[in-house]
């Protein structure tokens, strides 16, 4: 028999839903999460290309740095001489080992994330990760060029430890095509450490300027000038912002469905209802996280179909799916995040010391990842702190997206299951199986309470049945201790009973990113008197 709160479970899974798009699904609360390990990791570049979900074979994946320096194949048109931005150690016999500054001729760039190249220094030929190189003498090859990152992400990186006053970066303009923005770390007695932003405008006849008094032929010339004199800026440009080596896009060329023997499970990081999470090594070379699923947890065929969609979802705030072992027991191989789940992190001493600005920033990162999923018409279905992972510099990434509807266990059925995460689930999803991006918005509001309370279970003192009965009548959790009224108001907006009245993730991202700066100008004037 079903529980009292399961009034009507509507039909589940249509052809559209099987593709991972919005629809009515059963969900589950993935208890699998793992704990800390002192391993450094940096988020990969943002993936801007929107896939065609109905045609996996035709995907063209565009590395994050590519813009005006993009090569257009090896027919002699475009740039073919590239330079390494980072060191790289070969992972397979087909890879090239190389060091930062090494130059290559690109022989074949038609297969997405991994290019065939010949090293000019060693003469060897092999595969290289495309996001580890840039065209020689291009702006993308400069250490201070960070490409397509937003204002808030620039602030996160510049304010991270190791950057002095005057640390800077150049990024693409968020509003003007072909223009750039300069972000500089500054300090004063009133605000302490903070970041100021300047627009780098482009002249119609070519050239760039911040103030019309001084114009330059290139961005490189502009940077060199302001490293010598501040000329109206808040500070001299002292040094490029520190950068950690990015994740490669995938483990290696053609490393998607991998053999079980290529994975070494080294240490169990966590145990959940349907399997374990391990720290592992792929091919004896690459540290990864491995989720091992108990046989019968989900259909291998259904999992592989969903994984084909999941691997195309690439964003800085989503945990990258590297590879799968598709025969039971299923292995899901992802990038490793050194601090484990957000839920565990909030409860440890470092998490307990976090202050409101840091907590709001972590929420903004989750909202950014969900805004990407919103644009891609993809639903998470189990958004909560246990399914957010934390890396270096308080980087937050969304994990376990898309897996919820594949679980076959009735205990994760909202009608029958004691394990179903009622306290995070929107009423229309819990009562009728209507999972949409708007039910994810509801869950995000609950996640906000987890952040503010440093990992407290939602609706303290109430059981699941009481929660659903009360929520259906319009009950909201009261404002958590220490939570500003304006932030609680945003939570309440996510808990509106009518899903269409809930805000978008795009709005929530903007609200949270600007939460402490909405009264200040985002960019400094170029011409100052």
UniProtKB/Swiss-Prot annotation:
Write down what this protein is called: Tyrosine-protein kinase Fgr
Active site at 382 (proton acceptor)
Domain SH2: from-to ranges: 144-241
Domain spans labelled Protein kinase: 263-516
Q: Which Gene3D superfamilies match?
A: Phosphorylase Kinase, domain 1 (3.30.200.20), SH2 domain (3.30.505.10), SH3 Domains (2.30.30.40), Transferase(Phosphotransferase) domain 1 (1.10.510.10)
Q: Where in the cell is it found?
A: Cell membrane; Cell projection, Ruffle membrane; Cytoplasm, Cytosol; Cytoplasm, Cytoskeleton
Catalytic activity of the protein: L-tyrosyl-[protein] + ATP = O-phospho-L-tyrosyl-[protein] + ADP + H(+)
* Chief location: membrane
| Molecular function GO labels | ATP binding; Fc-gamma receptor I complex binding; immunoglobulin receptor binding; non-membrane spanning protein tyrosine kinase activity; phosphotyrosine residue binding; protein kinase binding; protein tyrosine kinase activity; signaling receptor binding
